[in-house]
């Protein structure tokens, strides 16, 4: 009972201090160090647990085979907990990028035996995203303000890719809500990528249920124009 009484005030206090930091690198570094999103399996949050990533892991294996994917950029990669064991084929080149430099260095050590794995520090709101057959942007946009989200999308669309996997809390038909709530980057709110300010085309290749703890969320596969 004491944990329940004190946990939420502490959590709110920590978040308030994190979001006051001016630079995104500082905010996300603090989130990582304090394990603010973490659960028992992953510092990247509950969406990266094996339980909550089951559907996307199954789907990603099929996507790699069906769409003949030979290279992947995972932006952001976090600690790679959900994706680390998908690539049995070492011919698939995997690049994980993230804004937390300490986590990138840790990943380089953790996955050094995987010769097809590489990692790079990037602020996705400032840097062009490395090109690949498939770019995965899982659980990112809903942590970015509208302003930073637009910066990220500008960089994303400057990259070359054949396919893009993107998170949305709406499939464009069911629960087709408008994006009205803005946040400070590092916080969270639900997003619908088919509505302003994102305006993704509803003509997508594949819809994958990527529910987190039973809450509606999707990964949506788009083909490059």
Predicted regions and their residues:
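Hydrophobic adenine-recognition pocket in adenosine-nucleotide-binding enzymes
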Residues: 140
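Class I (Rossmann-like) S-adenosyl-L-methionine-dependent methyltransferase catalytic domain
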Residues: 2-130, 144-225
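A conserved beta-strand element that flanks and buttresses the S-adenosyl-L-methionine
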Residues: 136
């Amino acid at each position: 009972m004491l944990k329940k009484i004190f946990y939420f005030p502490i959590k709110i206090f920590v978040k308030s201090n994190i979001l006051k930091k001016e630079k995104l690198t500082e905010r996300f570094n603090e989130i990582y160090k304090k394990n603010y999103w973490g659960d028992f399996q992953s510092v990247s949050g509950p969406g990266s647990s094996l339980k909550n990533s089951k559907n996307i892991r199954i789907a990603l294996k099929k996507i790699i085979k069906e769409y003949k994917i030979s290279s992947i950029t995972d932006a952001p990669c976090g600690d790679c907990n959900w994706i680390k064991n998908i690539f049995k084929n070492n011919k698939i080149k995997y690049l994980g990028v993230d804004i937390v430099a300490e986590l990138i260095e840790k990943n380089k050590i953790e996955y050094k035996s995987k010769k097809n794995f590489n990692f790079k520090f990037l602020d996705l709101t400032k840097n062009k995203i490395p090109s690949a057959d498939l770019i995965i942007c899982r659980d990112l946009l809903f942590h970015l303000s509208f302003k930073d989200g637009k910066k990220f999308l500008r960089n994303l669309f400057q990259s070359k890719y054949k396919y893009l996997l993107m998170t949305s809390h709406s499939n464009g038909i069911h629960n087709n809500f408008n994006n009205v709530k803005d946040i400070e980057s590092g916080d969270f709110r639900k997003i619908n990528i088919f509505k302003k300010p994102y305006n993704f085309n509803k003509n997508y290749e594949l819809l994958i249920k990527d529910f987190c703890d039973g809450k509606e969320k999707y990964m949506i596969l788009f083909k490059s124009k």
